[in-house]
Amino acid sequence: MLILTRRVGETLMIGDEVTVTVLGVKGNQVRIGVNAPKEVSVHREEIYQRIQAEKSADDLLIPKQRLVA
């Protein structure tokens, strides 16, 4: 894991098209802004895990159930 230190207003680059900017720090929370192309999904980890769990549950449905739902 790469560990970086940034101050408010500073940015880091991921590849050529994704930027992550530190917008603010308040207590133990950090506000960040992510600028990425539309085709790059950006989610908080807990949301990403929920999406993956829903996809897995959908894959377990038999085709007949998918048509009804």
Swiss-Prot record:
Keyword tags: Activator, Cytoplasm, Repressor, RNA-binding, Translation regulation
Answer yes or no on keyword DNA-binding: no
Signal peptide (UniProt feature, chain positions): none
Where this protein primarily resides, as one coarse class?
cytoplasm
Where does the record say this protein resides? Answer: Cytoplasm
Which is one GO molecular function term here? mRNA 5'-UTR binding
GO CC terms of this entry: cytosol
Q: Which InterPro entries match?
A: CsrA (IPR003751), CsrA_sf (IPR036107)
| Record-level GO BP terms | mRNA catabolic process; negative regulation of translational initiation; positive regulation of translational initiation; regulation of carbohydrate metabolic process
Pfam families assigned = CsrA
**Induction text:** Transcription peaks early in exponential phase, is greater at 37 than 30 degrees Celsius.
- Assembly and binders: Homodimer; the beta-strands of each monomer intercalate to form a hydrophobic core, while the alpha-helices form wings that extend away from the core.
Query: Which family does this protein fall into?
Result: Belongs to the CsrA/RsmA family.
Biological role stated in the UniProt entry: A key translational regulator that binds mRNA to regulate translation initiation and/or mRNA stability. Mediates global changes in gene expression, shifting from rapid growth to stress survival by linking envelope stress, the stringent response and the catabolite repression systems. Usually binds in the 5'-UTR; binding at or near the Shine-Dalgarno sequence prevents ribosome-binding, repressing translation, binding elsewhere in the 5'-UTR can activate translation and/or stabilize the mRNA. Its function is antagonized by small RNA(s). Involved in the process of swarming and quorum-sensing signal production; overexpression strongly inhibits swarming motility, pigment and N-acylhomoserine lactone (quorum-sensing signal) production but not swimming motility or swarmer cell differentiation.
Name under which the protein is recorded: Translational regulator CsrA
Organism source for this protein? Serratia marcescens
